[in-house]
Design a protein with these regions (language model features):
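Short acidic, Pro/Gly- and aromatic-enriched capping/linker segments at domain boundaries
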Residues: 1-6, 229-248
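Polysaccharide-binding surfaces and accessory modules of carbohydrate-active proteins
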Residues: 4-9, 13-15, 23-226, 242
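Primarily single-stranded nucleic-acid-binding OB-fold modules
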Residues: 226, 231, 301-302
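Terminal connector regions
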Residues: 262-293
Length: 338
């Protein structure tokens, strides 16, 4: 590894990753008009008053073995041993805006592969893969993706809800400690949407710097935003494992879910545009330029009165009007009697 600084760039966003001495995102924000690897040292944090002369980095895995007082990105053990791994980079592969970092801790017998991809839309994709390299099982308690956000991200927004009251936003000032979202229902729902946004206080649709994450996982999960006493802030997102649920045998590998992250300097609207473009470019499978069929849904036309003759008459009349997709909807509510 000759280079110690790597850049992922798009029209609106830059991500700078330093490798020496350990992998760390030193910048995630607006596009930098002028930057070279030699400028990486200018992004190093100064030593805070009353702190250690050597900073404890918020690495990609936020290991407690670095002396980071906070929630590490990886928690686990091998029958009480190898509980504080420190991952050292051994190889890096970069293809355009896709970076893969191979790390290991030979003392703990663990290997880690980190994938970071900055898409054309500006959405950053991150995930990790942990491999047990020893004969004894390694118990995984937590395995999270960690992203740093700057001190000016002083407000957090998340979403809650229920049936007919979905996606209700709520905001919390983030001045110290942290904000945690947990879902233990076994699936995603309106009660626990797997996303979180941190931004400058008072951010809204058209204004403010915002950093948002969405965890690509439909089971139990935990997302948190933590403010450290030295001013740094971080977002962590993970699948939530119950006691004893996840143990790696020798040679087995566990992946985190993909974390989809976005930075916008133009408020929530700019973030929405990035995620919308990302969905169209990489998630949606049908041809995006193909006109969508005109459809008719019967629910509010007939509710539970599903008479076959009447429905066929509706379908025939709808076809005459140009309807291309006819949807029979019984609502799935309490009036269903079959």
């Amino acid at each position: 590894m000759e280079e110690t600084c790597y850049r992922l760039t798009s029209n609106a966003t830059d991500v700078i990753i330093a490798l020496a001495p350990f992998p760390e995102i030193v910048y995630w924000g607006a596009h930098l008009a002028w930057f070279s690897p030699q400028d990486c040292h200018s992004l190093t944090r100064p030593v805070a008053n009353g702190r250690l002369d050597v900073d404890s980095p918020i690495t990609l895995m936020a290991e407690s073995g670095h002396g980071l007082f906070g929630a590490p990105g990886l928690e686990g053990h091998r029958n009480g041993q190898d509980a504080s791994p420190v991952f050292t980079p051994v190889r890096v592969e970069q293809q355009g805006n896709a970076l893969t970092i191979f790390c290991e801790d030979v003392n703990a017998g663990l290997g880690l592969v980190s994938e970071l991809v900055l898409t054309d839309s500006g959405v950053l994709k991150v995930r990790h893969a942990l491999t047990n390299q020893r004969a004894q099982p390694w118990q995984v308690d937590r395995f999270a993706v960690t992203l740093p956000v700057p001190e000016r991200a002083g407000e957090v927004m998340a979403f809650h809800g229920r049936w007919i009251r979905e996606f209700q936003p709520h905001r919390v000032a983030l001045s110290h400690d942290g904000f945690v979202l947990e879902n233990r229902r076994g699936r995603t729902s309106h009660e626990h949407f797997p996303a979180l946004i941190a931004g400058t206080p008072g951010f809204h649709e058209q204004q403010g710097d915002v950093w948002g994450v969405h965890l690509g996982w439909s089971g139990n999960h935990r997302i948190k935003c933590e403010a450290k006493t030295d001013g740094r802030r971080l977002i962590q997102a993970e699948a939530l494992y119950l006691p004893g649920e996840m143990a790696l045998e020798e040679g087995e590998t566990l992946h985190t879910p993909w974390l989809y992250a976005s930075f916008s300097a133009t408020g929530l609207n700019g973030m929405s545009q990035q995620f919308h473009r990302f969905l169209r470019d990489e998630i949606i499978r049908f041809p995006g330029d193909k006109p969508r069929p005109v459809h008719l849904n019967t629910w509010e036309g007939i509710y539970f009165n599903h008479d076959p003759a009447y429905i066929m008459q509706m379908a025939s009349r709808a076809a005459e009007l140009g309807v291309e997709r006819f949807i029979i909807d019984d609502g799935w509510f309490k009036g269903r009697n079959d």
